[in-house]
Amino acid sequence: MCEAFPESLPHGPVAVNVAVSAFKEATVTVISTPQEYNQEDLYIDLEAITGHQLFLKCEGFNFAGSVKLKAATAMVEAAERDGLLTPDSILVESSSGNLGVALSVIAASKGYRFVCVTDSRCNLSARLLMEALGSQIHIVTDPAPVGGLLGARIDHVRALCASDDRYVWLNQYANPNNHMAHYRTTAPAIARAFPDLDVLFVGAGTTGTLMGCARYFRARHRRVRIVAIDTEGSTTFGHTPSRRMIPGLGTSIRPPLLDTSYVDEVVHVNELDTIRTCHRLARHGFVFGGSTGTVVSGATQWLAQREEPVTAVAIAPDLGERYLETVYQTNWVQDLYGGDALQPRAVAVTGPTV
């Protein structure tokens, strides 16, 4: 079996809340599987750091360390309900790191075998974490003539599926459960916390988080402006592909999930600016991943070009521990980007390109 596109969609994990009494009453959360827990309502006020009122929704406080746990949980549970996964199935997925870790967590919890097809840009810590969880890692090194390393990863996944019908490819790039996970969880949580929201900044990778949030706000809160944050060198919004070294946001193949009619603006961020933003946040005690650095950088630049005050939220997809050997390593940064890597640099704000 190669691809799983289940029609039924999940309602997401639910934690069990119980009250215990010992001298005073306390509320605790009890779970039996790692995918049941996700810190949904944690925001950081970044005004003191960025100079603009910007609230950062932290999505990395779960057992997978990133927003990808939501999509992974939704896709696996839907495939189970639709009978696409059996005890003999082998999950396989192309991932630059975060979804691979999330699927590794779920596979370990449920007893599935999992093969993550990644490439040389995947951080070592992410690979080691997946292996610690019992997953197999296949690393693609040669880019495909069309689609680059992502295209090569997908080709490898298809070859595995063709070789053994036990493989089940959830296909995060086209699976509707990817964006519906955020339509049902992430977006409503933001709407509840910020009923007067003006603008939402969302990073664009597979575009699952982007499309789930964009579709929700279009349907229920049309006034909210959706600004997609992409990385320079990504082809997602029609730009010419170029070298990208930081895994996470950006693609070399336009994601099938993307519908640009739901996107109001696009900000493209240079990787140098991503690195500078990560370091700036770290100087204030917040160590975030490259995807979060890109989102905060793009949001800050967009806000700097607006004179009127707005209520703005940005989604932080990940934390920074998996980037300690890259984004936060001086030698790595200087080898790839030069000695002036921490000098300020502007980013471009554009309308969506179809």
Each language-model region and where it sits:
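PLP-dependent amino-acid enzyme catalytic core
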Residues: 1-354
